[in-house]
Amino acid sequence: MIDQKIFETTLNIDDPTNFCTNVEAHLLKELENIYVGKCFKNSFILNITGIIQRSPCFIMRTNNSGRGYMHVRFSALVSYLNAFDLIAAVKIIKNDSNIILGESLLTEPVTIVIPSSESQNNVAEVGQIVPVQLANSSVYYIPGRQQASATGSIFIPKHTFSVYHVQEELTQEQALNLTKLVNIIEMLLESRSKKDFKQICFFEKLYYTYSISSDEILDLKIWKGPKGKEMSRLKPCNVLSFLYDALKNKSSSLGFWARPPNLLKSSPLAYQQDQNSFNATELPIICSAEVMFVTLLKEIINYLQFMNDLCDTFNNEQLIKRHENIWMLIEQRKIGHDF
């Protein structure tokens, strides 16, 4: 994720006299030299965007070095990864019996450790590009390093889904706060509309949870696959439209919400029920409407960005064919696959 962050730090100044001849210019240069292109406080710093506050230049009195120091608050454009993030393009740089290593081609510099397993170890080849999901563990940003490190696995369709039980209405103020995420989804949908339709179909079908035959198609216009018939008694709700209605107090968020696997992964749809009849493996999660919508919207954003990145990365048939072994691994993990 790309974002703005504010940091506080203390800089050592070797030549206070020269530094103070043009404090702003020297300070900006010093910050860029120390932090840009490196890890710092759980982020990878891309650019210094401003100096918010600074102290005077103090002279060290604990020794006779003549050096100084300055306390600084500055803003920076940063990139950072979170647990369970999806990365569409990770290039395999090492694969042996003990470990698989990959480097992200799309995010800030990060080395990803893919724990060796019989299936993944026998499939992924050095030089190939694989889609990866980060594990439920911290991404490590060691200060001063020029790349982060993380663990993950080749991303395969998920069989499980969560059900959320909302017992309080979403307020207009909360709905307004969610419009930033809605705007991101709308921008990603606009970008998606410019992609090659054949590529979108290929990757949506690849990541559809159920195994389907070649003559079965996905209906990208209504964001459902052939297994959508199983829930035909329910009408899916467009989350984006729902939130626009919530701004006008024209919708109710009470009840049980879920995004079961019959919907396409990047679908902006969800199902809402008065009584829980979802066939989920876990008990419903009781939470506020705001928490539930933030969770759903971020999931939609992750999948939409993931699908767009897949289309951009594997942008020709030759490249797609060179990775048929990866696609086969993904297909074999689907519900209904004939082993």
Curated annotation (Swiss-Prot):
GO terms for cellular component: DNA-directed RNA polymerase complex; host cell cytoplasm; virion component. Induction: Expressed in the early phase of the viral replicative cycle. Keywords: DNA-directed RNA polymerase, Early protein, Host cytoplasm, Transcription, Viral transcription, Virion. The keyword Transit peptide does not apply. The keyword Repressor does not apply. Its main location: host cell. GO terms for biological process: viral transcription. It is found in: Host cytoplasm; Virion. It comes from the Viruses. Contains an extended C-terminus, with no homology to characterized proteins. Part of the viral DNA-directed RNA polymerase that consists of 8 polII-like subunits (RPB1, RPB2, RPB3, RPB5, RPB6, RPB7, RPB9, RPB10), a capping enzyme and a termination factor. Component of the DNA-directed RNA polymerase (RNAP) that catalyzes the transcription in the cytoplasm of viral DNA into RNA using the four ribonucleoside triphosphates as substrates. Belongs to the Asfivirus DNA-directed RNA polymerase RPB7 homolog family. This is DNA-directed RNA polymerase RPB7 homolog. It comes from African swine fever virus (isolate Warthog/Namibia/Wart80/1980) (ASFV). The lineage of its organism: Viruses, Varidnaviria, Bamfordvirae, Nucleocytoviricota, Pokkesviricetes.
